[in-house]
Structure formats: C-alpha cells, structure tokens
Amino acid sequence: MPPLLRVEGLKVYFHMPRGVVRAVDEVNIYLNKGEIIGIAGESGSGKSTLALGIMRLIMPPGLIEGGNVYFEDTEVLHLPEKVFNSEYRWKRIAMVFQGSMNGFTPVYKIRDQIKEVLEVHGYTGDPDQRVNELMKMVNLDPSIADRYPHELSGGQKQRAFIAMALALNPQVLIADEPTTALDVITQTHIINLLKQLRKELGISIIFITHDIALMSMIADRMYIMYAGRIVEHADTADIVRKPKHPYTKLLMEAVPDPSKDYIKGIPGFMPDLARLPPGCRFQGRCPFVMDICKREEPGLKRVENSEVACWLYG
C-alpha cells in the first residue's frame, strides 16, 4: 500500500537581505495510514517550516522553491490554491500550530470559533451538535465550549484546538509542538489523547517536537532534522536503542536524567542557513569531524535499519 502522504525533495527558502535562507532543503518524508511519525530537532532546524510547506502556508519572504507533496496518489503542492484550500487543507490535512493554545480569539467563545471553521468550509450538519461531538472526542465536557479562552487551562485550550483541527474529519493531523508550555502531567495527557485519536479515528499524525524523549513515547518512526535537512530516519525503537548520526546521539544524551545533577547540552551553534559552509552542515559541532566532512555534504544512506547522512558510515 502506498503512503498516505509523501513529501519528495521539498525546498522552502526565505529570500532575505542577507541572503537566501535554506530553511527546508530537499527533504523527503512519508506517512503511512494510521501511523504516527515524529520530526525532531533543535529550534531553527526547519521542522515547523516543513509542516507549513506541506500545508502550503508559507508566507513572504518565504517561497516553496521545489519538490512535490503527494496525498495518496494526487500531487497537491502544485494544485490551484482554490482547489487545495477547498479539498485538502483542513478537510484531509489539518494542523495544530505551534503555540496554538494561545491562538483562539479572546473575545469569542470556543464554540463560536469552532462553528466558524465548520461554516466557512460548508459543513451541512448541525454545527452545535458537531462541536459537542468534537469536545467529547478530546475528553472535554461539551459545556467547556461555551467558555471564553481565558477561562480554560492550558491543557484544556490545547485539547480544544485539537478538536477544532479535527472538525472536518481530516485523515492527517500535523501537531507542531503540541505540548510546549504545558506541565509534565498535561504533556502526558496530550500524548495519550493523540494515541487515542489514532486508535479510534484511524488518523495519521506527524508529531513535531524538540523533545526526543517525548517523541519516543508516541512515534512509530522518527526523522531527525538538522539545519534544513533530514540527517537520520529509522523506527523509533532503533533510534532510541542505537542512534547513529552524531547529532542524534547528542540529542539523546541531552535528555535530562533525574539521577544526575547536570544537563548535558550540545556544544556550538547551528550554522547560518544563509551562509552554509561547504560539506556537512553539522561539521562545526561534530566530535567526529573528518576532512571529507568539510568538503562534501553526505547524503542519506542505509546503515543497518536506519537511513543516516554521515561520512562515518562511508
């Protein structure tokens, strides 16, 4: 069975006065039906831009410079905007944006804001009944929809925004940092909710985070992203057990350990995406850097059960 969603060679560049920022540079990912994949990396690695590129929500000075996005067998990146907006965006592919729990309009009740989404997209059923269904779907009492955003806790707002993203029964949900600014207990509740939605609705999920430990709780497969490129891809169990790219190893080592009184960070800084060095983009921070790393950029190659972009593996 072909993937439900497939991204091939996606490029998203930002044309700035200081140069062209290659935020997403020839990225390939795929998502199977009923699967949860994770995209992990530090802030600035291109994760959110990749998601916005899939949704075709890149704003100037950003441009989608190349690549393809396939939903089932249909190439959707180059469809007319009117067609993509009416047939795919929110109806087949929906997104919970980073910081979305603060994205509700403060002067309108939650119910009215979800109903507006339904009405704009031509929903023909009873909108109030649909809102009630959606609230129950995310384990909230329907009466919460009759409150203003400021009357909800952070976890309740995040659940309500997930409900709004599910309003039109999408087959794919992109969740961009859905647990940011939530306490650990609430984070776990959101993770469990997404798992529940996958089980009950059969929805496929792209889960984006900088927290690789959190991702290991939910994702079937992981993509590790650095400076606009995928540097490692494997089943979650394989990455957790035996990470191969030096960056992935350092991300794993940076996960806080309660038994230790310090946190190990990753030394150095991500390169300027408008002035990328020749060769590997991780060379300036890599403890295993070699001469070839400074001359040639590695491509993804198969190493055991993983795909890795690193000269350590030939």
Report residues per predicted region.
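P-loop NTP-binding/switch modules centered on Walker-like glycine-rich loops
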Residues: 178, 182-261
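Conserved ABC ATPase signature
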Residues: 148-152, 156
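ABC ATPase NBD coupling module
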Residues: 76-94, 120, 238-243, 273-277
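Conserved ABC transporter NBD signature motif
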Residues: 64-76
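Conserved ABC ATPase "signature" region
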Residues: 126-143, 252
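A short, proline-enriched helix->beta-strand linker immediately N-terminal to the Walker B motif
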Residues: 167-171
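Short catalytic/signature loops enriched in Gly
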Residues: 233-314
